[in-house]
């Protein structure tokens, strides 16, 4: 069974200082059933039509997913991965979401799941303890709070959990190195493991956050 990975859908602006929002992650589709014509190919996977076209003006109107490629696609080119993806022409998640829309989408979408074993993953006890302490402090903050977590307990996922569960308007993260800045930027873009099918701590209906990365003075 052959597969092909469709590119993510995102909004991005800026060059050095970047603002980014992931609208939909990569999609892996089976390419066993492919309809071809002179301008485009339609992959049918689980009843959903994915159209890949080399011409932005010619594509399958019935397909909810339409992706522009650098050349006319064929099944063999998809199998060989001999095709370059350019941009989404049509996607169900192509929406304009304001920061308020994002925050509102997080309401009642966070689950306080405790990790029991490898088959039932969730947040570790130190993470849940820190998260509850943070949320309690945020209800009536009179002064700054400091949360200390042991090495290896998952500080990043705790920050991401606080962002969504607390429906924070803004979170500022400072880091000591360029490498860590890029690493955390990528984590915040995707919400780490929180939205993955394995964890499902954050529901799939919740929108991804709008994330900025500052690398130079304004």
Residue spans of the language-model regions?
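ATP-binding Walker
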Residues: 153-154
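Conserved RecA-like ASCE P-loop NTPase motor core of nucleic-acid helicases/translocases
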Residues: 170-177
């Amino acid at each position: 069974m052959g597969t092909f990975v469709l590119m993510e859908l995102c909004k991005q602006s800026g060059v050095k200082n970047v603002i980014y929002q992931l609208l939909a992650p990569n999609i892996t589709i089976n390419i066993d059933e492919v309809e071809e014509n002179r301008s485009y190919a339609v992959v049918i996977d689980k009843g959903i039509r994915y159209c890949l076209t080399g011409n932005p003006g010619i594509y399958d109107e019935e397909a909810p997913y339409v992706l522009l490629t650098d050349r006319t696609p064929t099944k063999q080119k998809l199998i060989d991965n001999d095709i370059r993806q350019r941009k989404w022409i049509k996607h169900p998640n192509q929406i304009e979401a304001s920061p308020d829309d994002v925050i509102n989408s997080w309401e009642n979408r966070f689950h306080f799941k405790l990790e029991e074993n490898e088959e039932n993953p969730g947040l570790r006890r130190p993470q849940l303890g820190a998260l509850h302490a943070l949320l309690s402090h945020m209800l009536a903050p009179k002064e700054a709070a400091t949360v200390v977590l042991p090495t290896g307990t998952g500080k990043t996922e705790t920050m991401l959990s606080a962002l969504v569960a607390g429906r924070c308007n803004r979170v500022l993260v400072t880091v000591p190195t360029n490498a860590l800045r890029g690493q955390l930027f990528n984590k915040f873009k995707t919400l780490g493991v929180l939205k993955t099918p394995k964890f499902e701590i954050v529901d799939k209906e919740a929108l991804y956050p709008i994330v900025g990365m500052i690398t130079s003075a304004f």
